[in-house]
Amino acid sequence: MDKKVTLAQLKEVVQEAYDQVKTNTGGKNADYIPYLANVNKDLFGISVCLLNGQTIHVGDTDYRFGIESVSKVHTAILALRQYGAKEILDKIGADATGLPFNSIIAILLENDHTSTPLVNAGAISACSMVKPIGDSAKKWDAIVENVTDLCGSAPQLIDELYKSESDTNFNNRSIAWLLKNYNRIYDDPDMALDLYTRQCSLGVTALQLSVAAGTIANGGVNPVTKKEVFDASLAPKITAMIAAVGFYEHTGDWMYTSGIPAKTGVGGGVMGVLPGQFGIAAFAPPLDGAGNSVKAQLAIQYVMNKLGLNVFSDNHLIVVD
């Protein structure tokens, strides 16, 4: 069923979400990465990107924060572009682990594959697959170019975050070499880990992430730049991955309460994809116990529920002037 709203009405809903959530004091910044612990906890922004390229944004949507695990979506798309859907399914997989995002146990339980590129093990594996094999500099260029194409503008590496991540990524070092033990990493493990750490340290804005989400929702065509970033056949594949594991072991609850596939990161960002309709992103540093932004979750849930939209319903938003 079509749900018609004016652009002004949609802006009002986004503003309402911001106003309703802004004063929430729940959660706390990630404290196991020193840089993230020191980000201003009061920062908060919401951005929506429509498929015609129009954006609606409220709050701190131009602040660059650490993309963290939201970058897993971007590199999964790059791997899908370079290898195709079947090879990624065979070499990495698309299943949720039901365990925390940085789980080593998940590798031990399912050592024939890494489950999904949207948890740490699968993301490190995906970084190892990025072409050209064996060339760290060119791999990095491909990763950054892909993020730029999806977001419509370039990210910026946050050097302090990269150092902070590199100094504390002991668990991920174990993951990389355990993957090597099971032949589930496809380039040098240390190189793959460094690429993964760097991509998580890219600085992006909520506005940029909403455009990236809009690109997925638009079947691979960036709504703002109009560039075809990836083939339309891959959009349902990456959206399925996000829907299955975007909030890790809490994805079921998220889908039940929000109705939108979304990926979260410990930098405070959440990026949601409503296929054929829009992309949405929100950012606020304080996280819940599972590492998901408290305010960003509430804001996106408010917008979805207020508009009566759900990826599993036949409601379709039409924005009119």
Task: Tell what function each PLM region has.
Residues N52-G53, G66-L89, A212, I280:
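Active-site SXXK
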Residues G219-D321:
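Structured C-terminal helix/loop/strand segments within mature extracytoplasmic catalytic/sensor domains
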Residues D62-R64:
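A short acidic/small-residue loop/turn micro-motif
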Residues L36-V39, T114-T116, D167, G259-K263:
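Short Gly/Pro-enriched turn/cap motifs at secondary-structure boundaries
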Residues K22-V58, M271-G272:
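A short, well-structured edge-of-sheet supersecondary motif
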Residues D2-Q20, N24-G26, A79-Q199:
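Active-site-adjacent helix/loop patches that line small-molecule binding or acyl-intermediate pockets
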Residues A137, S166-N169, W177-K237, D288-S293:
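Penicillin-binding protein/beta-lactamase superfamily catalytic region
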Residues M1-L10, D19, T23, A30-N40, ...:
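Non-catalytic interaction/Regulatory regions outside core domains
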